[in-house]
Design a protein with these regions (language model features):
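A residue-level marker of the well-folded mature domains of exported/periplasmic proteins
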Residues: 1-174
Length: 174
């Protein structure tokens, strides 16, 4: 499907952590895509599609992320792309976006909510299961492993952990 944004559209992106290599790569890709889009559409000056990319420096700083989402919504963006640290904590912001007819695209974390228009994410459960297979192979299909999750409230982290532990329990019980 063709993407034909209106001149002057604002794509607001709020991520979990602006300091991580993953999100730096996402920002680089999104910046290049918006540049290409502006060239393709012939947008110049104020007609260019604008991309803002914000978030806390620390992936555990839920309050800072909520404040960032509030500030972004005050700018009335055309669309909000969000990778929430804790989806339950930003319900009011999602309701505000819906009330202002700002579509919400969730990045990197699955979420089940009528307040979200679409989700763009890895199948984190499958990624966790694949990590378990590789780990089991590396240790001869038996032994003990420890799980060190990076973010307890992150749906992506929870799904990866669940995929990993269920794969280990099912296929590598020793």
């Amino acid at each position: 499907e063709e993407l034909n944004p209106e001149p002057g559209s604002h794509i607001a992106v709020v991520v979990k952590n602006t300091k991580s290599n993953f999100w730096a790569t996402v920002k680089k890709g999104m910046t290049a895509a918006v540049k290409d889009l502006n060239e393709k559409m012939g947008y110049k000056g104020d007609d260019k599609v604008k991309l803002s990319f914000e978030g806390p420096a620390d992936e555990l700083d839920v309050e800072s992320q909520i404040n960032t989402i509030d500030a972004v919504l005050a700018e009335n963006p055309t669309v909000l792309c969000l990778s929430a640290i804790d989806m339950e904590s930003c319900g009011a912001q999602l309701e505000e976006a819906m009330g202002n007819e700002i579509p919400v695209v969730i990045l990197d974390s699955g979420v089940e909510s009528e307040l979200v228009n679409t989700v763009c994410a890895t199948d984190n459960y499958a990624a966790g299961a694949e990590a378990a297979k590789k780990m089991a192979e590396a240790i001869g299909n038996k032994g003990q492993v420890a799980i060190m999750a990076h973010a307890e409230t992150s749906k992506s982290s929870q799904d990866r952990e669940k995929g990993f532990t269920e794969e280990i329990a099912k296929n590598y019980p020793e």
